[in-house]
Amino acid sequence: MRIEALNTAPDATEVRFEEQIRPQSMSDFAGQKKLTDNLKVFITAARKRGDALDHVLLSGPPGLGKTTLAHIIAAEMGGGIKITSGPLIDKAGNLAGLLTSLKKGDILFIDEIHRLAPAVEEYLYSAMEDYRIDILLDSGPASRAVQLKLEPFTLVGATTRSGLLTSPLRARFGINSRLDYYSPELLQSIIVRAAGILNIGVDEDAAMEIARRSRGTPRIANRLLRRARDFAQVANEASISLAVARRTLESLEIDEGGLDDMDKKILEAIVRKFNGGPVGVASLAVSVGEEQDTIEEVYEPYLIQVGYLARTPRGRVATRLAMQRFSYPGMQDHGPLFDHNS
């Protein structure tokens, strides 16, 4: 499988780590069983017909395995993969260069596809539907359009904000799948597997402690595993024990529920500064000193999932659970409150 990374690369250490532990097949991919079972069927059928796989849209919070699935799809279809992201394709010409370089059966993976420029997105429509693009030669009165045929390919788009996709783009994906947060038990198995590949000793109860505080996210679980390894090595421990895991998590200020410092700042701001809400996300971002997009894409989904936050037409509102935990003594409750399961 050919891999060409066109996006801004992470640091070398992160790349080596991800390459070492990345599952190589659908069978190796932990969790998301219904999604992977369906993809196995679609891939097998496409290969039997000798066709390119239908275009695939993968949505869900960051760190759940969308990029890994794109690599697995490429491997199981027997093609190469080109990797880029929506913000990097700022001109139709850039997209044309990518599309014309694809070979039959290749995968084009576009991360953050919801951030494609409108002109670039429209250029993608004919490529997805008919495997062709129109290129404008020259400019002014002498300009003319030339149609180029493309090799059959599969576009795999990944998004953390599926609601921002336009209807015409969404309609062109034949396969639309959403990834959900992982259970602590699944994350524990992912941690144990990664530790085995990296030759890191980890006790089962330590792996579960890390899993419980990983926000249901494999990327976070693997990152915390690496940090726990650091603490174990500095303490001259042969493996990551429960005590080492807890010391690591406490040092990183990650609480029993997986909330980190920014999670707590967000909830404390809503509860204490805005009296439980509602508050607009722009005001909230200014209050905690974080980018609005980061709050919406990284922090909010998990806080909603675990019942601390609710979205309403008027803004973000702390649930009763959040009010009980983050209210200061003597604080009065005003405004609408939501039970965590409402």
Swiss-Prot record:
Residue ranges of coiled coil: none
GO process annotations (BP): DNA recombination; DNA repair
Annotated stretches, region: Small ATPAse domain (RuvB-S): 183-253
Region ranges (Head domain (RuvB-H)): 256-342
Enzyme Commission code(s) on record: 3.6.4.-
Pfam (any one): RuvB_C
Region Large ATPase domain (RuvB-L), residue ranges: 1-182
Gene Ontology terms: cellular component: cytoplasm; Holliday junction resolvase complex
Key word Cytoplasm present: yes
InterPro entries in the cross-refs: AAA+_ATPase, AAA_lid_4, DNA_helicase_Holl-junc_RuvB, P-loop_NTPase, RuvB-like_N, RuvB_C, WH-like_DNA-bd_sf, WH_DNA-bd_sf
Reactions the enzyme catalyzes: ATP + H2O = ADP + phosphate + H(+)
Alphabetized UniProt keyword annotations: ATP-binding, Cytoplasm, DNA damage, DNA recombination, DNA repair, DNA-binding, Hydrolase, Nucleotide-binding
UniProt enzyme class: hydrolase
GO molecular function: ATP binding; ATP hydrolysis activity; four-way junction DNA binding; four-way junction helicase activity
Record: residues binding ATP: 21-22, 63, 66-68, 129-131, 172, 182, 219
Subcellular localization: Cytoplasm
UniProt: DNA binding residues: 311, 316
Binding residues annotated for Mg(2+), in chain numbering: 67
UniProt note: domains: Has 3 domains, the large (RuvB-L) and small ATPase (RuvB-S) domains and the C-terminal head (RuvB-H) domain. The head domain binds DNA, while the ATPase domains jointly bind ATP, ADP or are empty depending on the state of the subunit in the translocation cycle. During a single DNA translocation step the structure of each domain remains the same, but their relative positions change.
SUBUNIT field: Homohexamer. Forms an RuvA(8)-RuvB(12)-Holliday junction (HJ) complex. HJ DNA is sandwiched between 2 RuvA tetramers; dsDNA enters through RuvA and exits via RuvB. An RuvB hexamer assembles on each DNA strand where it exits the tetramer. Each RuvB hexamer is contacted by two RuvA subunits (via domain III) on 2 adjacent RuvB subunits; this complex drives branch migration. In the full resolvosome a probable DNA-RuvA(4)-RuvB(12)-RuvC(2) complex forms which resolves the HJ.
Function as written in the Swiss-Prot or TrEMBL entry: The RuvA-RuvB-RuvC complex processes Holliday junction (HJ) DNA during genetic recombination and DNA repair, while the RuvA-RuvB complex plays an important role in the rescue of blocked DNA replication forks via replication fork reversal (RFR). RuvA specifically binds to HJ cruciform DNA, conferring on it an open structure. The RuvB hexamer acts as an ATP-dependent pump, pulling dsDNA into and through the RuvAB complex. RuvB forms 2 homohexamers on either side of HJ DNA bound by 1 or 2 RuvA tetramers; 4 subunits per hexamer contact DNA at a time.
Family statement: Belongs to the RuvB family.
HAMAP family for the chain: DNA_HJ_migration_RuvB
Protein name stated in the entry: Holliday junction branch migration complex subunit RuvB
Phylogenetic classification of the source organism: Bacteria, Pseudomonadati, Chlorobiota, Chlorobiia, Chlorobiales
Originating gene: ruvB
